Amino acid sequence: YSSKDLLNWKFEGIVLPAVKDDEKHDLHPSKVLERPKVIYNEKTKKFVMWAHVESADYSKACAGVAVSDSPTGTFTYVGSFRPNGAMSRDQTVFVDDNGKAYQFYSSENNATLYISELTDDYLKPTGRYTRNFVKQSREAPAVFKYNGKYYMLSSGCTGWDPNVAELAVADSIMGQWTTIGNPCTGPDADKTFYAQSTYVQQVYGKGNAYIAMFDRWKKKNLEDSRYVWLPLEFGKDGTIAIPWRDSWDPRTQWEGQGDFSAGKGTFLLNGKPFVIKAAELHYPRIPKAYWDQRIKLCKALGMNTICLYVFWNSHESQPGVFDFTGQNDLAEFCRLCQQNDMYVILRPGPYVCAEWEMGGLPWWLLKKKDIRLRESDPYFMERVGIFEKAVAEQVAGMTIQNGGPIIMVQVENEYGSYGEDKGYVSQIRDIVRANYPGVALFQCDWASNFTKNGLHDLVWTMNFGTGANIDQQFAPLKKLRPDSPLMCSEFWSGWGANHETRPAADMIAGIDEMLSKGISFSLYMTHGGTNWGHWAGANSPGFAPDVTSYDYDAPISESGQTTPKYWELRKALSKYMNGEKQAKVPALIKPIRIPSFQFTEMAPLFDNLPAAKKDRNIRTMEEYNQGFGSILYRTTLPEMKTPSLLTVNDAHDYAQVFLDGKYIGKLDRRNGEKQLEFPACPKGARLDILVEAMGRINFGRAIKDFKGITQSVELTVDIDGRPFTCNLKDWEVYNLEDTYDFYKNMKFQPIGSLKDELGQRIPGCYRATFKVNKPSDTFLNFETWGKGLVYVNGHAMGRIWEIGPQQTLYIPGCWLKKGENEVIVFDIIGPKEVKSEGLSEPLLDQLLVTKPLTHRNEGENLDLSGEQPVLSGSFNPGNGWQERKFDQPVTGRYVCLEALSAQDGKDLACIAEMYLLDENGERLSREPWIVNYADSEDVSHVNCSADKIFDLQESTYWSTTKDTPYPHSVVIDLGSTRTLTGIQYLPRMESEVPGGIKDFKVYVKSKAFNY
């Protein structure tokens, strides 16, 4: 029989005819064949029937198998046997997500239930089986999978007299199985409604929709031998129930529910093929008042989905203190997506990267100094579980299965670039799955590393950038999973250290190619927004703090304006609307200019210090329960009759050193600065070290990024030609928390001079008011200021730094008010002029640095004469990682890669990433690496400096300038002497592989190279 609605049925014919002329045949009318089950074999394209085959006296106890090309038959009978040499009575068959099939059957005179793995053709057992519920007399097994766990419904054996049903659960299909109890409720539940379990059928395309199917038979009323079908109910606490219903309608039972899953070569939305066109944007980076407009802009592009991260540290500022209000109202953001007919892909971490402070992890985790982040550390996993549950309490009811917009949820984030630990990733998966039952789960990574942590029961997606060779990026996945739907879950639209832009044509071409091939994508970012306050992260290796603007060169600018990229992308997406019209582009917010205004009040920092904490030893910010802002370390010095050397190990991130109030110098972590020449001083001289914490590193192993001074402060003096070092003790510590309340409660005074009595700029708070007649967006200009943080009307706007490249801060009009508005600047250096103005355009590209971006001094040339290479060779053309081994291990600290020629014969040389292999053939940590020299670096329009070869980002790269001929060379200081056995090289990911290196040499030395 067949049905399209489970109510109206069509007779299709006899699928397995009786064999009437052979009394010995299993299909002779004198024999018994019961509980037939049919499964489909994707590999053989056959439908396979398994059934319980019996003699009239029930002594045969065999399994029978038949096959057909169609579910309606006719089936060809293969034969019967006792699987694994054991009796086989009541039985069912089940196909797992990976295509493996299993038979469940009552054996040993119904005393024990067997689970037997089947061969790939599903026609016989492999010999691998388990015995379950030993001597518990279970029969009539019905098996289903829900939320990553296996469930078995079964009956007791009471001689054709209905009894209590039992539900059991297991993490592995072969067991161990744990009995939950009777799921049936209502009248006659203890008799399973006078029926016995036979099958549990999932209703595809209807969310968490399952039907429990029973055979009814009453010993004293055999005329009432019918089917009993009842829907399963799933509780939020994980319970499963089968309540009695006198009647129910499968056409309306799951009304409002939907389903999203991975089908063969495509995603399925309510059972139909669906291509995800996702716009990535992050609700904490957008003013709440503008959420709806930004979502509408994405909809008008032609997108159908919003992809978003959930930032743990934004929601849980202290352990157990959660905030899902205002700017953090995740549920409201998801509701707005649904109101705008947009689906949602939820990425709840716990780690997110996103150029966000500590990759989204909360700073207070570092109060436990030995914590292992992103590993199976008990405390870390405990806190992850608490956070993920809190998030789920907000939005788990908004999955598509519950009538909401959330179609997929991500497990962890790009873990392959962090490590290899399937156990940890599996734990995160289990936490996520428990919170979002029935939802499609996925994990994203790069084509070069996704297999490290790929879990078999998750969808795998790839991340790569504009210009990438798309077929090459998906080739490894297609080889392992030829039937998997393809998705680029982060198609990077822009990326850079200074404000970088990327050609729209590359982005459009990539999206067009993916859509033409039915490949789903998420454009990262479609709208970047702003890293308000102290939320901007930092990149690594080295230390490269991010700016406040997260404009990202995205189609929608930081302030919500449409860019040329937007209109070109909208035009491209118009071809892929499946007959629908693109939504109307919403009205844009016109920015305003605000006339120049002066700051009138100041609160000098050193006159407004909070109460000091006394400490014998140096400690980090986190040890003082401080997460953000600045920290002042103060101590008195012994008499120093001669100049000395001050060493700070290490200042995270920007330290200014004062002696009796006089500025001595700065220590900038970006430049690896740790030491200052220190003048002679009398006993009792006051040493002040003011350390500003910038964003914590958000990528790689360095995310365990403590702030303040992390180890020690030492003075080294030369006495009679011998160095003596003093580890300074007995500190007064002043915690300068980055909060509006801390700044506004300082003692302000009218601004007089901007220099102190020593002629130095004055660190502290500066306050002004400015008037607005009609509030709208603007960009406040801070070109004349030093370094610090800005608040407008109590809102944390972000960081400023005179070096640029960002000189303005985006001020949303929704945070301004008609009339007077307040602005407070906390400047740790002090301003040159106390003025600002509102511009109608941002200044994001004014980089004013004394240190050049390149790694070659004027007139400097690498001298390799007399040097012997440890390796001479050639790389292959094309994309992807390549490895070359040295003839023998070599030891050294300085490594030079000399590129001798290009694959295309042109001048350009490029390297996306490079690793060196240690004595065990493993990748050497690149954390301490420093570029000593590069003969050519293109930093004119994009930052393609040589340190891009170890920035952990496969989409960025070192590039020489186009007019500089071969050979090209780069020299790296490994930080210490290491044993090396080989090199790994990754060219650019574009299909034409611009700058691909052909012939090369590698040099390794213990001493620095000559220039």
Report residues per predicted region:
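Catalytic-core region of carbohydrate-active enzymes that cleave or remodel glycosidic bonds
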Residues: V164-S172, I180-P187, T192-K218, G467-S557, ...
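Aromatic, loop-rich ligand-recognition surfaces of beta-strand-rich domains
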Residues: M797, E860-G866, S874-Y1011
